[in-house]
């Protein structure tokens, strides 16, 4: 503290003239943005003219400028972002599923479990996303629907690959992508290859379970069908989990995944019914009735049927 009448010490933010005649020169209160923090905020780097920033790393300029509404309607932005973000999540789901597939082929099951769990959480995220789109009313959607043309989520090539990778194969679903040879090649490759569940069935055989040869070497372009020898293997796993712990955990991860996938499908059809009722879909399908039919698809049939047998 300075004696009354003395000038303020050097460096004090108050001028000497202001300090004179006071009982004491008070220390200036801390104010964000004061001198000393002008060059940086809490030691954070603020100059990115010569280094990579957050936006640079995430390519935000490209992502945030990828929304191009075709209608004057305010709600179209929601519709676009809902579907774009869903495609990003599906990209990650495919990435994780293919990583898990490689792990199963090499008998590295613990890493596969982690990746499968992540896919299930991604699907839960996609389920919650329908709550946002559900804020769109029928009248709001009707205002922008004419601008969509024939475009439809039915044509999502990432979703189609996800279905194929999970075993719901249908060669007719290649046709919507025939106009894009590069995309068609990707989707066809997924159709032609064993599904994730096919590789798990092969894993059962490698672990000594007597799986029918016709199940181990089949037409991979066909959807998964129930097989008695596969169910018998899962029955043994569930009856003696301690002896087959990795396979037991694999079974439960797959059930979790299909459970989440079913919830996503259900929220999809419910949202469609809420917004457009039973109108035909923009892609030419029957809309909600088509989506309801998809609710009956079972991806891993033996894992569900074995619960009745236990």
UniProtKB/Swiss-Prot annotation:
User: SUPFAM superfamilies from the xrefs?
Assistant: Indolic compounds 2,3-dioxygenase-like
GO terms, molecular function: heme binding; metal ion binding; tryptophan 2,3-dioxygenase activity
Q: What is its EC number?
A: 1.13.11.11
Entry annotated with the keyword Iron:
yes
Q: Which reaction does it catalyse?
A: L-tryptophan + O2 = N-formyl-L-kynurenine
Briefly state the protein's biological role.
Heme-dependent dioxygenase that catalyzes the oxidative cleavage of the L-tryptophan (L-Trp) pyrrole ring and converts L-tryptophan to N-formyl-L-kynurenine. Catalyzes the oxidative cleavage of the indole moiety.
| Full protein name | Tryptophan 2,3-dioxygenase
Q: Which species is listed as the source?
A: Burkholderia multivorans (strain ATCC 17616 / 249)
């Amino acid at each position: 503290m300075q004696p009354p009448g003395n000038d303020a010490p050097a460096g004090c933010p108050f001028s000497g003239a202001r300090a004179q005649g006071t009982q004491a020169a008070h220390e200036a209160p801390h104010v964000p943005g004061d001198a000393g923090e002008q060059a940086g905020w809490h030691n954070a780097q603020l100059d990115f003219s010569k280094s990579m920033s957050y936006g640079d790393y995430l390519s935000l300029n490209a992502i945030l400028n990828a929304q191009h509404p075709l209608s004057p309607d305010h709600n179209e932005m929601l519709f676009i972002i809902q579907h774009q973000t869903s495609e990003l999540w599906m990209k990650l789901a495919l990435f994780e599923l293919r990583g898990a597939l490689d792990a199963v082929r090499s008998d590295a099951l613990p890493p596969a479990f982690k990746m499968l769990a992540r896919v299930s959480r991604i699907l839960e995220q996609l389920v919650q996303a329908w709550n946002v789109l559900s804020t769109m009313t029928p009248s709001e959607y009707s205002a922008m629907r004419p601008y969509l043309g024939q475009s439809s989520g039915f044509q999502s090539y990432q979703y189609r690959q996800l279905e194929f990778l999970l075993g719901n194969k249908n060669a007719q679903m290649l046709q919507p992508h025939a106009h894009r040879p590069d995309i068609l090649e990707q989707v066809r490759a997924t159709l032609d290859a064993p599904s994730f569940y096919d590789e798990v069935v092969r894993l059962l055989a490698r672990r000594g379970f007597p799986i029918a040869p016709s199940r181990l070497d089949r037409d991979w372009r066909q959807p998964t069908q129930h097989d008695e020898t596969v169910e018998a293997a899962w029955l043994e796993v569930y009856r003696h989990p301690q002896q087959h712990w990795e396979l037991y955990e694999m079974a439960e991860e797959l059930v979790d995944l299909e459970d989440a996938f079913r919830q996503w499908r259900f929220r999809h059809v419910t949202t469609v019914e809420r917004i457009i009722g039973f109108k035909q879909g923009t892609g030419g399908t029957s809309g909600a009735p088509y989506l309801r039919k998809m609710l009956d698809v079972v991806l891993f049939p033996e894992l569900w049927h074995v619960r009745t047998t236990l």
